[in-house]
Each structure stands twice: as structure tokens, then as C-alpha cells.
């Protein structure tokens, strides 16, 4: 459940900015039918930063309800205050989630010791499996391999989503952890190379709109069929890249609406709709990927 193509799911909203139950159900059904390994609910792509604390929990619980056991759900539980991270994680204890994805604290930029103590404290306050999430471009803090190695010794810290974009991190981390520690990419554009170096999959933005393709890509990579995987990835590369023509999740929400997967591309301020220029770029990327 922590390997293969895991979707970083968008949080669909109606025209008024309220969570849209019907669109969320449609998305979940799409991923069940496509064979997606698991859903991350309310991560970065799910607009965790603009949902209230209560809404955050409510969306995860609604996702669990609508999934109804058909696909594993991983809860996004990142916070830049350790106590809040503990509180959010505890809300999902015994809820049915299979684990939590916990981003490094953002904005306050803790030291490596602070990062270690943050994740250690959260892990010690739950039985839920914890997956670390390193994305320095958003948080301003880099979780270094040595710190990951220390954290990997904690029994319920089971892996990391590594989105630094530096492929050397795969081997650096592998040298410091046991073989059962899960390494997944957080960058669609480099995810195939990440898997070829020994990674186990990807937590994917692209999978929101190309679920079957990302499932196939990961399956080919896990089988060692990198020649076929590269052919597929070449078709998707423009899409991987152009889904970030404006800040995530602006482009992918527009694309999901364009493909009829969600009813609107509504976002919460300060996120604003995709510009006309961005729409043209993403439209072409969808065509290049043979999705239109």
C-alpha cells in the first residue's frame, strides 16, 4: 500500500469553496477502477494549507467513508507545531487510515535535531505507520539523510516521500536504513529514475488525471522493464512538467475539471484559478499525453 502509484489527491470543491462530496466520490471511484495503490488525503495537493483544522480531519474521514475499504487511505498530517501534529494524528487513530504522511515543519525552519524530535514525538504518540515527507522548496527545511537514518530506527516510521529532486538522495538514504524502509518519490518528472535507483514508487500529482498510466509506469518499473517504462514516461513528461506551470494544485485541478473528473476547479484563496496562458499550456500537455 506504500508502494507503486499513490495519488496525492486534490480536494474537489463546489463553486462556493465547500468540499464537493459528489466529485470526491467520483475521484475515488476512478482510482479504485484504475488500480491506484493508495490515496493521500489532504496533503499539499489536497490544499491542506487552506483548510481549517476541523475541515482537514473531516475531509480525511469523508474520503474514508466514500472509499469504503476499496482502497487504502493515507492521511496528510503535516504541521509546523509538534503538538498540532500529534493532535491531528491522534484524530485518525482507529479511523481506518493505513498511515500518515507528515511533512517537515514549514516556515519556522527547525534544526536537524528539531526535526528529529518533531517526528519522534509524533511517532511515539501513535500506533499508526508514519511516512516522512521532505520538500524543501515548499518548507524551507531539508531533512538530511543522516536524520532520516536516525528516524528510521523508530518502529512506526516506515518510509519517506522524498521530493528534493536530487536523485543522489536515494542511495544516500539507502545506505542508512534497512531494506524494508520505503522510499517513494514526490516528483513525477524524476520518479522513473528514482525507481530505477531502488525507490518503491511515487506519491503522484499526475495520477490525479492519468491514474492508469501512472499505475502502469510503476508496475513496469517494479518489474524491471525500464525500456517500456521510459516509452510511457516520455509520453507523460510534458504533463509531469506542465502541471507545475503555476503552483500546485492550480493546474491539476483545472485539468481534472477539463477531463470531467471533478465539477469545478475552485480553489481557496490565496490560490487563484489557472490563467488563460496556463490553460493553453496544460491543454496541450493533456493532448501530448493522449488524454484528450
Curated annotation (Swiss-Prot):
GO terms for biological process: diaminopimelate biosynthetic process; lysine biosynthetic process via diaminopimelate. Gene3D superfamilies: Aldolase class I. Signal peptide: none annotated. The active site is at residues 133, 161. PROSITE patterns: DHDPS_1 (PS00665), DHDPS_2 (PS00666). It comes from the Bacteria. It is an enzyme of class 4 (lyase). The record marks 44, 107 as: Part of a proton relay during catalysis. Its EC number is 4.3.3.7. Keywords: Amino-acid biosynthesis, Cytoplasm, Diaminopimelate biosynthesis, Lyase, Lysine biosynthesis, Schiff base. Pyruvate binds at residues 45, 203. One of its GO terms (cellular component) is cytosol. It catalyses: L-aspartate 4-semialdehyde + pyruvate = (2S,4S)-4-hydroxy-2,3,4,5-tetrahydrodipicolinate + H2O + H(+). It is found in: Cytoplasm. One of its GO terms (molecular function) is 4-hydroxy-tetrahydrodipicolinate synthase activity. The keyword Lyase applies. Pathway: Amino-acid biosynthesis; L-lysine biosynthesis via DAP pathway; (S)-tetrahydrodipicolinate from L-aspartate: step 3/4. Belongs to the DapA family. Homotetramer; dimer of dimers. Catalyzes the condensation of (S)-aspartate-beta-semialdehyde [(S)-ASA] and pyruvate to 4-hydroxy-tetrahydrodipicolinate (HTPA). This is 4-hydroxy-tetrahydrodipicolinate synthase. It comes from Erwinia tasmaniensis (strain DSM 17950 / CFBP 7177 / CIP 109463 / NCPPB 4357 / Et1/99).
Amino acid at each position: 500500500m506504500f508502494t507503486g502509484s499513490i495519488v496525492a489527491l486534490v480536494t474537489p470543491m463546489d463553486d462556493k469553496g465547500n468540499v464537493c462530496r459528489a466529485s470526491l466520490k467520483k475521484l475515488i471511484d476512478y482510482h479504485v477502477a484504475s488500480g491506484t495503490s493508495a490515496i493521500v488525503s489532504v496533503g499539499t495537493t489536497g490544499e491542506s494549507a487552506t483548510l481549517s483544522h476541523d475541515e482537514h480531519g473531516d475531509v480525511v474521514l469523508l474520503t474514508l467513508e466514500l472509499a469504503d475499504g476499496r482502497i487504502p487511505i493515507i492521511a496528510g498530517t503535516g504541521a509546523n507545531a509538534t503538538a498540532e501534529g500529534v493532535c491531528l494524528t491522534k484524530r485518525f487513530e482507529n479511523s481506518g487510515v493505513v498511515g500518515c504522511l507528515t511533512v517537515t515543519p514549514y516556515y519556522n525552519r527547525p534544526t536537524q535535531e528539531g526535526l528529529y524530535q518533531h517526528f519522534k514525538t509524533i511517532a511515539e504518540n501513535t500506533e499508526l505507520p508514519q511516512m516522512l515527507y521532505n520538500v524543501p522548496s515548499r518548507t524551507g527545511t531539508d531533512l538530511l539523510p543522516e536524520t532520516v537514518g536516525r528516524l528510521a530506527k523508530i518502529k512506526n516510521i516506515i518510509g519517506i516521500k522524498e521530493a528534493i529532486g536530487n536523485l543522489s538522495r536515494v542511495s544516500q538514504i539507502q545506505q542508512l536504513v534497512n531494506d524494508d524502509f520505503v522510499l517513494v518519490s514526490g516528483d513525477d518528472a524524476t520518479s522513473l529514475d528514482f525507481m530505477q535507483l531502488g525507490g518503491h514508487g511515487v506519491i503522484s500529482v499526475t495520477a490525479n488525471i492519468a491514474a492508469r498510466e501512472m499505475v502502469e509506469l510503476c508496475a513496469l518499473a517494479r518489474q524491471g522493464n525500464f525500456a517500456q517504462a521510459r516509452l510511457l514516461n516520455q509520453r507523460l513528461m510534458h504533463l509531469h512538467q506542465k502541471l507545475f506551470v503555476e503552483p500546485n494544485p492550480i493546474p491539476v485541478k483545472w485539468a481534472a475539471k477539463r477531463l470531467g473528473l471533478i465539477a469545478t476547479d475552485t480553489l481557496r484563496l490565496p490560490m487563484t484559478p489557472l490563467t488563460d496562458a496556463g490553460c493553453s499550456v496544460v491543454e496541450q500537455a493533456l493532448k501530448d499525453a493522449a488524454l484528450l
